[in-house]
Amino acid sequence: MTWLLAITTMSAFAQQATVTGPDSFLKVNVSVKQGIPVYSVTYKDKTILEDSPLGFIANVGDFSRDMTFTGQKENKIDKTYTQDRIKQSQIHYQANELTCTFTNKEKKNINIIFRVSNNDIAFRYEMPKYGDTGSIVIEKETTGFDFPSFTTTFLCPQSDAMIGWKRTKPSYEEEYKTDAPMNVRSQYGHGYTFPCLFHVGENGWALISETGVDSKYCGSHLSDATTDGLYTLAFPMPEENNGNGTASPGLALPGSTPWRTITVGENLKPIVETTIPWDVVEPLYPTEHTYKMGRGTWSWILWQDGSINFDDQKKYVDLAAAMGYEYVLIDNWWDTNIGRERMKDFIDYAHSKNVDVFLWYSSSGYWNDIVQGPTNYMDNPIIRKKEMKWLHNIGVKGIKVDFFGGDKQETMRLYEAILSDADDNGLMVIFHGCTLPRGWERMYPNYVGSEAVLASENLIFQQHFCDEEAFNACLHPFIRNTIGCMEFGGTFLNKRLNRNNDGGSIRKTTDVFQLATAVLFQNPIQNFALAPNNLTDAPQVCLDFMKQVPTTWDETRFIDGYPGKYVVLARRHADQWYIAGINAQKEPLKLKLNLPMCTKGDKVMLYQDDKKLNPHAEEITLKKNDEVSITMQAEGGFLLVK
């Protein structure tokens, strides 16, 4: 631990505390070494994290060095809760809790709370009031994650601030590198966005993220690694939000930081199935509204800006009605190209087809150069509340708010304010061009999704992203989508990604691959990339599946896969299982799958690519208990519906 050698202050002795998960396999050791609070993590006695620093530097004192371990207490957590909008509807969370008290040389205390379940660690700092001091500014966290040198990484770089379209980055849309060594500098030199996946050789896997971020803190990310494999928690860059607002979060005392989470397993199953983002947070406000999840159409993804007019939007309402979908999303420029006066007429037309409406807004404000309208409605509370009341009165069911400015506390306040005001008016909210959701499905009852990923629009913009579509799609179930909703906006049935299905980017993946992503990518409101022409030019088997696919799930199980190569998941909606797989490799992949939800004699519907890569569906009878043999074509997929 070379980072320890630079510290010369020695404590008289190193006290230690240990907490394990209920099954005792996952263990956290906490101690003080050379005045620095540290923790380490093992799973089944194999090292996941070596001694890693804890603490922070604040305006009220330094809690990163010259610290003494002065107390500890233990507790057990056992709670059951229900949650819509995530990968599982019924959750039983059991964990052992350890509270460690550390005292700095000024005799000021902090508590570090660890909650350890069988495969998850969540920890945070709690600060009391210090005399008459009623607030604190956290200037820097020294929280670290020190991996063994042989660890490889699956990470998405943090971009420069104020770059990209109209200076709107960072927005969690950079390209991943897989199985990369730790000692390579990130693309921009700013570290990596959460969540961060690590393969600790034969010792196992670890996923690092955070949850419970609201208006009282900023969003964080990981730094670049030191030569010793140490990543530390990094705050937003000062340049974010066009330089407005501080990068250092402030909060009232007593107070606490968000939870930082580490999910650990000897394989990828605990990573994919984790519910830790929601286990340690609680709803922030009740709602008097009933929000309906479902599927939608949106013209912008294929027909782009020119389609935001009354007549084209009616075509997408008709498409939604033909598919039995609940929603249509009207994207940017509706305020000028359709007009506020005609919007009520449009919504009345949609309602006549049993389709409800989402409308797009810019987050607006003074932090980028966006001109697409509507602008200057969401950043000002007086204007925002008036606008949302109007939306409620004309029958709009939700909004999609785009182009945020970064991860500073100032922006987190805006996310929360939009959500809270929207709930007052019965509006659901999707975020786009945005930060990562951090437990928000449980915290905010009207939150229904975030992009925060290199999403479907990029397939339209560049052929490169079509060429890499299968690779990227085989990453998301292991990384981005495992910690929160992912509003991807995909499932294309056009072969060519333009309005007339005759030009633009060429889709490389098969139709069944596209169908499988409707199950693999989890978001409670799914705006699919279908087009009106698909009603006549897409295979009927694809349309039939897309008419019945759900968007909410009661259970999710990892079946098989490796990030960037292939993935197979099983999701249950009510009493029906959807087992979906995709293959990113350039040759067919034969798999013998263990499916505990299947038994000999079950009749299931199998969707596969034939040898000409055309979709084919047939009912088959399973010949064995728990086992099915599948072949996925190159850049193809399969589905089993039971």
Model-assigned labels for residue ranges:
Residues A252-Y327:
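An acidic-aromatic substrate-binding cleft motif
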Residues M1-Q16:
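Bacterial Sec-dependent N-terminal signal peptides
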Residues I620-K642:
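C-terminal beta-strand-rich structural cap/linker in extracellular carbohydrate-active enzymes
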